[in-house]
């Protein structure tokens, strides 16, 4: 569960506080260099923000769905009670406890 709570720290955006003038100078140099090259305009939409708000919920739903599928897979993989396959698979149980549900119909 710790990995789920850690995702918020990795996926959230960070706000940079006002730093030293040297960092500001570097940004200015990078911005000036970018003006010389062709820069494509990028449009940000509100859809990204909505997706970020539901990230944890979607992750929990995915985990729950995976758990349900794994339990359903185990349930369907079990042999029917009282069948020859069940008696063969659970032979030690059927010998020690002949009245066990898996050994009888």
Curated annotation (Swiss-Prot):
It comes from the Eukaryota. Coiled coil: none annotated. One of its GO terms (biological process) is photosynthesis. PANTHER family: PHOTOSYSTEM II 5 KDA PROTEIN, CHLOROPLASTIC (PTHR34940:SF1). The maturation of the PSII-T precursor to its final form occurs through a two step process. First, a stromal intermediate is formed, which, upon translocation into the thylakoid membrane, is processed to the mature protein. It comes from Gossypium hirsutum (Upland cotton). May be a component of the oxygen-evolving complex. GO terms for cellular component: chloroplast thylakoid membrane; photosystem II. This is Photosystem II 5 kDa protein, chloroplastic. The gene is PSBT. Its main location: plastid. The keyword Kinase does not apply. Keywords: Chloroplast, Membrane, Photosynthesis, Photosystem II, Plastid, Thylakoid, Transit peptide. Residues 1-77 form a transit peptide. The keyword Transit peptide applies. It is found in: Plastid, Chloroplast thylakoid membrane.
